[in-house]
Amino acid sequence: MTPGRAAGIVLLGLIGVLGFHRDAAAQRLELAISPAVITVPSADPDSMPVLSSSPVQVNYRVRQNNRQTWLLTVVANGDLVSGASTIDISAVSWIASPSPPFQNGTLSKTTAQMVATGPGNVASPSTGTLTFRLANSWTYDAGIYTQTLVFTLSTP
């Protein structure tokens, strides 16, 4: 990236809710991510080597889970893309709270990454937050970069 040019990042969130337990029809899993579009602002890499999004709210609930462990994962559909330019998705990480059940991590386009896990039911709707961070660099071409993230809440 040349001086005076900026790269903005937009991550689009998709939500998946899966139940794989043998009595899956009885399980009730709920997941909501807000906002659905996550924006990381642009800035001079010398003054801001790491760029952060506003906190993303993760609302989830697990019921009738028969004491099984639940798992929340995220995977990117590819690298960040702006026209012909790309930024490796592994340049994007997140800071999570509360810990537990949430944990910090780095995005991947090949392997779903664990965001949170816990035992049994989460009877009341519960909330966690994720703050996405981009390792900023002058090597990025100016542009608006986008990618889709798929969040999945599942039980074994």
How would you describe each model-predicted region?
Residues M1-G4:
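N-terminal secretory signal peptides that target proteins for export/translocation
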Residues G8-G19:
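Bacterial N-terminal signal peptides
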Residues A24-P156:
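N-terminal small/polar-rich segments of proteins
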